[in-house]
UniProtKB/Swiss-Prot annotation:
A single MF term (Gene Ontology): sequence-specific DNA binding
Pfam family, one: Homeodomain
SMART domains: HOX
Species of origin: Xenopus laevis (African clawed frog)
Name of the featured protein: Homeobox protein vent1B
Gene behind this protein: vent1B
GO cellular component terms, semicolon-separated: nucleus
Amino acid sequence: MVQQGFSIDLILARSKEEAADGKDSMSSRPHIPCAPQPLPPTKYAKEMPRRKDGQDVQEHTTSFQCSLGEQGNKLQYFSPSPAALHRTWGSSDEFSSAGSEDDTNECSPRPVRNFQDTDHNGKSTKSDRRLRTAFSPQQISKLEQAFNKQRYLGASERKKLATSLMLSEIQVKTWFQNRRMKLKRQIQDQQHSLVPPPVCYPQTFPYYPGGFPVPLNSGSFYQPPALPFQAPQHSYIPDQRFIPQPLPHHVRMSGALQEQYPPLFRAQYI
C-alpha cells in the first residue's frame, strides 16, 4: 500500500494556517466600499422639477447592483446625499462648462422684487413727479394783472412780484410760461373759427352769341340743358353812325343820269 502523506491533523493545521493568513491579509488591506460612480447628468435630470427639501435627488437616483465574490450577494441600493452628488457632478470631466453655468444660475438666489411699492402695471406707487402749486384766487388775480401789462418779466420784476405774492421766482416764471402757451392756443382757435370754409362755385364760361368758336368735347365742359334763346333784359341802342342811311334824292337822280347819258370820251374807247 502507498502510505498516505496527509493526515487529519496535518490537514487541520494547514487549514488553520490559511485562515490566519487570510485574516492578516484582510486586516492589512484598506476597506473599500462598493459604491459605483454616479452617472453624468442628462437632459431629463437637468430639467426635472426641483424641490426645496432636496427630495427630488433622493427619489430619482438610480439604483445600482454590487456583486461581491463569485457566489453573488443581494442587491444593494445606494442613495448619495445631495451635497455629495453635487460635488461628484461638479468634478466630472464630461460635465460641460455651459451646464455648470446653468446649474449655478438655477441654484443661485435671485433678488426678490418687493411688490408692495408697485402697482399691477409695474409702476411705482410713490409719485416722483413735482407737486403742482395751488395758487389762491388773490394770487391768480395779481398774476393776471401783471400778465396783461407785460407778458415777459425781467429778473428784477419777477423777483419783486414773487416777493409780493409770497411765491418763489420759479413758480412765477412757470406760471407766465403756461399763461403764454394758453394765450397762444386761444389765438389759434379764434383764427381757425374766423376762417370761412371753402365754397365750391360752378364753373363759368364766356358768352358767345353765335356759339362757341371751336367745337368742344362734351365731356370737358359743363353743358346746361337746352333752353330757348332769351334776349337780354336791358335795351340795346345801336350807334347811329354805324347804321347805313339811304342816299338823298338828288344824289340818286344824278347818278341815274350819268348812267343813262355817259360822257363823250367814253364812246371813243368803246
